[in-house]
Amino acid sequence: MDKVRIAVLVSGGGTNLQALIDAQSSGVISSGTIALVISNNPDAYALERAAVAGIATEVVNKRELGSQLAFEDKIMEILNCNKIDLIVLAGFMSILSEHFTTMYPERILNVHPSLIPSFCGKGYYGLRVHEEALAYGVKVTGATVHYVNEIPDGGKILLQKAVEI
C-alpha cells in the first residue's frame, strides 16, 4: 500500500514541522510521508528544517502573485503536481478561502494553539492566542487539531490536549 503523501504549509520557524519530521523519523508517523513543504514566506526557517530533512520545498508569495485567488491557485497547482493526499497547516499564517478548502474536503488539518472554541477564529493565531488566554485569566489552555473548512477554526475537531497554566 502506498503511503499518504503529506504537504505541510508553514510561515515561520517550523517548530511544528520539526515535530512532524521527528515523528516521521521515529516511526510514529508510519502510514504517511512528508513529501513537500510550502511556505508563503521565503525567509521562513521552516524551509531550512525541511531541506535538512531532505524534503522538497516551494515558496508561494501572495504579494508577487497579486491576489488571494492567484496565491491559492498556485498552491493547488503545486499540490496537484506533487500528488499530495493530505495538507497540514503548521504555523501557516494565511487564511485559506472557500475556493481552496472545498477542493480538499477533510484533507486539510490545522494545529490551533488553543482549545477550540476558545480563542479562535479570524485574528487568533500565533502568540496572540496565548496573550489573550493569559489576559483573560484562563487556568487551562491547550491545542486543537481540526479539519479546515471555509470558517476560520470552524472545522470538525479531531484531537485536543489540555495544558494547565
Labelled PLM ranges:
Residues 1-165:
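One-carbon transfer enzymes
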